[in-house]
């Protein structure tokens, strides 16, 4: 049986994770330090599609390991409806495959303006 595209992608995960950690070590360490210092009482995620599935996995990991509740917020709240969210004691985590999705970027900007660590 021929190897599927999904099987190839799954097999690439360890190398992709290593590349991410090697290339982003400074940013990851800075984010971890900011989270430790701020100690948010709640976290929110901003994502679409398959990235939202990754956010759901993150939700369970954070809730189980750190005891911090995590909720998903809709990017369109900021990008379409232009409504601010009060996120003063929150960490806001954006997940995007490209890092350039306009609605995710806009929600992250809005969350920062609303007081979130983003």
Question: At which residue positions do the language-model features occur?
Answer:
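Glycine-rich phosphate-binding loops that contact phosphosugars or nucleotide phosphates
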Residues: 36-118
């Amino acid at each position: 049986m021929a190897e599927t595209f999904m099987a190839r992608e799954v097999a690439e995960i360890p190398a992709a994770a290593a590349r991410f950690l090697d290339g982003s070590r400074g940013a990851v360490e800075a984010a971890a330090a900011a989270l430790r210092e701020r100690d948010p009482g709640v976290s929110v995620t901003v994502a679409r599609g398959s990235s939202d599935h990754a956010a759901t996995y993150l939700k369970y990991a954070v809730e189980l390991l750190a005891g911090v509740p995590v909720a998903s917020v809709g990017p369109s709240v900021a990008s379409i409806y232009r409504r601010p969210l009060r996120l003063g004691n929150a960490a806001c985590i954006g997940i995007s495959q490209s890092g350039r999705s306009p609605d995710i970027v806009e929600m992250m900007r809005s969350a920062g303006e609303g007081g979130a660590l983003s």
